[in-house]
């Protein structure tokens, strides 16, 4: 059970990181 929670947490952090990087690139392109 703990492994599932850890996996979901890792997946969520990776997804959030990807979104942050994507938004950063969009802001750079807009400027």
UniProtKB/Swiss-Prot annotation:
The protein's name in its UniProt record: Cytochrome b6-f complex subunit 6
InterPro entries: Cyt_b6/f_cplx_su6
Domain of life of the source: Eukaryota
HAMAP family xrefs: Cytb6_f_PetL (MF_00433)
GO MF terms, alphabetically ordered: electron transporter, transferring electrons within cytochrome b6/f complex of photosystem II activity
Membrane topology: Single-pass membrane protein
Organism per entry: Oltmannsiellopsis viridis
Keywords per UniProt: Chloroplast, Electron transport, Membrane, Photosynthesis, Plastid, Thylakoid, Transmembrane, Transmembrane helix, Transport
The UniProt record lists the keyword Transport: yes
Assigned protein family: Belongs to the PetL family.
Function (record text): Component of the cytochrome b6-f complex, which mediates electron transfer between photosystem II (PSII) and photosystem I (PSI), cyclic electron flow around PSI, and state transitions. PetL is important for photoautotrophic growth as well as for electron transfer efficiency and stability of the cytochrome b6-f complex.
């Amino acid at each position: 059970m703990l492994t599932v929670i850890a996996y979901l947490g890792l997946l969520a952090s990776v997804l959030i990181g990807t979104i942050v990087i994507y938004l950063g690139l969009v802001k750079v392109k807009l400027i």
